[in-house]
């Protein structure tokens, strides 16, 4: 049997089993891999809810769901490093979930919220954002271990998605009728600009050298639960 290791992090105790040694060979215990992949699945689920909420016209809740996905996206990698459960499968699964959460979900939010009033042009603008997110994620995948981790090449897809979500919230508070407003074209331009920033060659500081231990894991989970409560209120 493997040796049990107890690791305490920000007040949370994790118990992880080391690799078992059977007939002189180490057998990796796969249970710990479920934790980060489960968090990734929750991020994907939140993105799926955002898509359905956008289609039903619940734009504020759809935007909140994108915020939840962004928080969970930061938590899965953190959990993987903490549990030493990083894997190629987890990286690919996370990337596919990010495409839904930060590519499709914000694009559909922008379209149903405002761009639909521009007809095919609005649909094209939403597609540009989604396509740029796909390009950005693909480029990020092949640059892992190649570029300086302190910087992103192009705006990170979660941040671009949050720009769409937060601007939607602001415009909802202003109670603008996009069916009769000239601001619709500006929102379309804004959507395209956010997309193009993702595929630009501009370097953005990644904050990956920031001490994330200052933000306890339980605080992030509390933020997620609070947003979930607002969505289902």
Protein language model regions, located:
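Hydrophobic alpha-helical transmembrane segments of polytopic
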Residues: 39-42, 62-66, 125-132, 160, ...
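Multi-pass membrane catalytic core of lipid/isoprenoid biosynthesis enzymes
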Residues: 33-40, 82-137, 167
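Topogenic membrane-insertion module of multi-pass membrane proteins
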Residues: 1-74, 203, 223-227
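Interhelical loop and helix-boundary elements at the membrane-water interface
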Residues: 4, 15-44, 79-99, 138-159, ...
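C-terminal membrane-associated helical module and adjoining short loops/tails
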Residues: 1-24, 149-233
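Membrane-water interface of alpha-helical transmembrane segments
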Residues: 23-26, 30-40, 56, 60, ...
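Helix-coil boundary and interhelical linker segments in multi-pass alpha-helical membrane proteins
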Residues: 49-64, 100, 104-124, 167-186, ...
């Amino acid at each position: 049997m493997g040796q049990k290791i107890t690791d305490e992090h920000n007040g949370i105790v994790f118990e992880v089993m080391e690799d078992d040694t059977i007939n002189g060979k180490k057998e990796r215990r796969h249970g710990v891999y479920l934790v980060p992949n489960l968090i990734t699945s929750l991020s994907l689920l939140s993105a799926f809810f955002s898509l359905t909420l956008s289609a039903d016209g619940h734009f504020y809740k759809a935007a909140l769901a994108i915020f939840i996905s962004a928080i969970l996206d930061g938590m899965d990698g953190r959990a993987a490093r903490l549990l030493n459960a990083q894997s190629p499968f987890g990286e690919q699964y996370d990337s596919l979930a990010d495409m839904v959460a930060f590519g499709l979900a914000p694009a559909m939010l922008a379209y149903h919220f405002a761009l639909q009033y521009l007809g095919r042009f609005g649909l094209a603008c939403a597609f540009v954002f989604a396509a740029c997110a796909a390009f950005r994620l693909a480029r990020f995948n092949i640059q892992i271990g190649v570029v300086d981790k302190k910087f992103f090449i192009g705006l990170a897809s979660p941040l671009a998605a949050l720009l769409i979500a937060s601007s939607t919230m602001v415009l909802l508070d202003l109670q603008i009728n996009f069916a009769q407003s000239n601001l619709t074209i500006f929102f379309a331009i804004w959507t395209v600009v956010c997309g193009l920033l993702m595929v630009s060659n501009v370097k953005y500081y990644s904050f990956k050298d920031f001490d994330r231990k200052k933000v306890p894991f339980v605080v992030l989970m509390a933020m997620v639960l609070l947003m979930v409560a607002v969505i289902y209120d």
